[in-house]
């Protein structure tokens, strides 16, 4: 008798198939049929969990984004209380960033999917609002840096946060795809590039 999967187990299988397909073939080549075949489930299983492909894609992206946000939340609470010196702040920045970098480098399929989704037509205003909410901890951190460094309040926090996230993710994806030799850049150099706007404003 075939094992019956829970809804969360089915979603996990579908999302992993989406990651693999998007990484291997490009996000525009992902279809419901390919997703079903990729995880060994019949197409009706998908529609029990998601109304359509955009809903599946968006859930896959937001779950990954939430994992990163939760990671940053934990790290920020551990390292940020009581910090009031520039050196301490830069050290905390390195710790937070390093964990994000390790997350990106640990799962190439997920990292490539997330970046391709971000650049695709699937990424719209609603997803952007979720992203702002998920990265509130990082935005608060950037604001703390700004206050310590005397950054003008007119500087857009979201732009700074996006630069950190996007610069780091772009480099990781290029490494996974072979566009950048993984030995050509040290994590410290990638970090310095990602945080260059924040520490030199």
Locations of the language-model features?
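Hydrophobic/aromatic-rich alpha-helical bundle segments in the mid-to-C-terminal region
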Residues: 3, 116, 147-194
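Secondary-structure edge/capping motif, primarily at the C-terminal ends of alpha-helices
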Residues: 75-83, 111-122, 172-179
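Helix-turn-helix
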Residues: 13, 17, 21-55, 59
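Helix-loop "lid/cap" segments that line or gate small-molecule binding pockets
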Residues: 98-105, 113-122, 196-198
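N-terminal intrinsically disordered/low-complexity leader segments
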Residues: 1-9, 73-80
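Short, basic, alpha-helical segments at the C-terminal edge of helix-turn-helix-like DNA-binding modules
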Residues: 32, 61-70, 76
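Hydrophobic alpha-helical connector segments
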Residues: 73-106, 160-161, 188
């Amino acid at each position: 008798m075939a094992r019956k999967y829970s809804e969360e187990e089915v979603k996990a299988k579908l999302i992993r198939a989406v990651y693999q397909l998007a990484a291997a073939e490009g996000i525009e080549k992902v279809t419901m049929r390919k997703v079903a075949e990729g995880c060994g489930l019949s197409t009706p299983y998908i529609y029990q969990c998601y109304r359509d492909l955009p809903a599946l894609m968006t859930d896959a992206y937001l779950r990954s984004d939430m994992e990163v946000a939760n990671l940053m939340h934990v790290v920020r609470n551990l390292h940020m209380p009581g910090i009031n010196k520039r050196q301490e702040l830069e050290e905390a920045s390195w710790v937070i960033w390093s964990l994000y970098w390790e997350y990106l480098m640990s799962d190439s399929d997920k990292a490539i999917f997330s970046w391709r989704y971000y650049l695709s037509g699937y990424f719209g205003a609603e997803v952007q609002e979720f992203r702002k909410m998920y990265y509130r901890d990082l935005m608060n951190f950037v604001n703390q840096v700004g206050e310590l460094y005397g950054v003008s309040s007119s500087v857009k926090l979201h732009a700074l946060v996006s630069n950190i996230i996007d610069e780091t993710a772009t480099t990781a994806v290029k490494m996974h795809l072979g566009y950048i030799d993984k030995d050509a850049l040290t994590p410290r150099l990638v970090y310095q590039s990602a945080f260059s706007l924040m520490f030199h404003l």
